[in-house]
Curated annotation (Swiss-Prot):
Gene: rps4
Statement: the UniProt record of this protein carries the keyword Isomerase: no
Oligomeric form and interacting partners: Part of the 30S ribosomal subunit. Contacts protein S5. The interaction surface between S4 and S5 is involved in control of translational fidelity.
Annotated stretches, region: Disordered: 16-40
Cellular component per GO, a single term: chloroplast
Protein name (database record): Small ribosomal subunit protein uS4c
NCBIfam families noted in UniProt: PRK05327.1, rpsD_bact
Organism: Euglena gracilis
Localization terms from the record: Plastid, Chloroplast
Length: 205
């Protein structure tokens, strides 16, 4: 399954807030003539659909394909400890996510574009693979070019950026970020139950 490239707010309406996909929030529209308050019977949601929704949150928030997410789940289940925690760590340590979280790009999709176009360096080496897994102590900065530096400087000055999590540090003057360590679960901005995602794939792994 390929990445979703349609209207972002449509996804937000369906599965909830996705901070890395878009900063915009969805407002429910009322049909003409619809009363201010209407009571509708809530349909009982199956366990499968609950797990599916949590899985979709990860897919859309981190901008990954179904195959990529499945591979991360497989890797996580091979680790000793909480599979759900390892899954989130893999996703958070992706280069595109790091680029977004440090403010070099306003969204995960914008981060992917920066990386694909060769604007980002990791430890002084240009990396053009969004799924590249970063390591603690790595240094992230723009390529030494006026174009790359200007694009990132403009993004950093935006008022719509998310708060930088404590496992990352940013020197705005030098346009240089450092990965201090692995992310703490509490610092993950997405509201998701990662254990339900592991359960969703339990029969496929």
């Amino acid at each position: 399954m390929s990445r979703y490239r349609g209207p972002r707010l449509r996804i937000v309406r369906r599965i909830g807030k996705l901070p890395s996909l878009t900063n915009k929030t969805s407002k429910k529209r009322k049909s003409p003539g619809q009363p201010a308050t209407s009571f509708k019977r809530k349909k009982k949601i199956s366990k499968y659909n609950i797990r599916l929704k949590e899985k979709q949150k990860l897919r859309f928030n981190y901008g990954i394909t179904e195959r990529q997410l499945l591979n991360y789940v497989k890797k996580s289940r091979k680790k000793k400890g909480s599979s759900g925690r390892f899954l989130l760590t893999f996703l958070e340590m992706r280069l595109d996510n790091i680029v977004h979280r440090i403010g070099f790009a306003p969204t995960i999709m914008a981060a992917k574009q920066l990386i694909n176009h060769g604007h980002i360096c990791v430890d002084d080496k240009v990396i053009n693979i969004p799924s590249f897994i970063c390591q603690p102590k790595s240094i992230i900065k723009p390529k030494k070019s006026t174009v790359s530096e200007n694009v990132i400087q403009k993004n950093i000055e935006s008022k719509e950026l998310l708060l930088i999590p404590p496992h990352l540090s940013l020197n705005k003057k030098n346009l240089e970020a450092k990965i201090i360590g692995l992310i703490n679960r509490k610092a993950i901005s997405l509201i998701v139950n990662e254990l339900l995602v592991i359960e969703f794939y339990s029969r496929k792994v």
